[in-house]
Amino acid sequence: MKLIIGLGNPEARYSNTRHNIGFEAVEALAAAFGAPFSKGKGKYLVAKIRHRGEQLMLVKPMTYMNLSGHAVVAAMNFHKALRSDILVICDDMNLPSGTLRLRSKGSAGGQNGLKHIIESLGSEEFARLRIGIGLEEKPQGGYSSFVLGKFSTDERNVMNRTLEVCTEAILDFAVNGISHAMNHYNKPVS
């Protein structure tokens, strides 16, 4: 069993923002399998799918990005998941738009959702999939206004294709492991 955790903010006003691309990734995968989200045993929503004999629990924390660790710990405890069973999906403004970056472990790299998960787990030892949202220069309104901003039409087109490939990368992780997925998906989406 794998826990696939897409990070984002739960309110409707954050829908389709750059910061919610993690939510969009698990929503796209759930939709591809016709799996609805329902309330989990904690502050998260969960959808269940099965792929090639592997059960995947798709998780959307309802705690806001900066407190995601609470929902991750609750989901891990309820589903008896190990750190090696989880993949956290989040935005990364330091990666070019449409680039996927899988890692087996590492720092938060300035991403506050990852930072809180690391603090809550007491470890950086869990897989993550960062989706590049392409900050090219410091935005006038600051970083918050950028990550909480909506995608432009061109950016949305790139993200739609990126989410298709992201779905493949998640399934590859679930079946073949993080190293295999890293070797096949750590690149810009074309």
Curated annotation (Swiss-Prot):
GO terms for cellular component: cytoplasm. TRNA binds at Y14, Y64, N66, N112. It comes from the Bacteria. The active site is at H19 (proton acceptor). Keywords: Cytoplasm, Hydrolase, RNA-binding, tRNA-binding. It is found in: Cytoplasm. The record marks D91 as: Stabilizes the basic form of H active site to accept a proton. One of its GO terms (molecular function) is peptidyl-tRNA hydrolase activity. Monomer. This is Peptidyl-tRNA hydrolase.
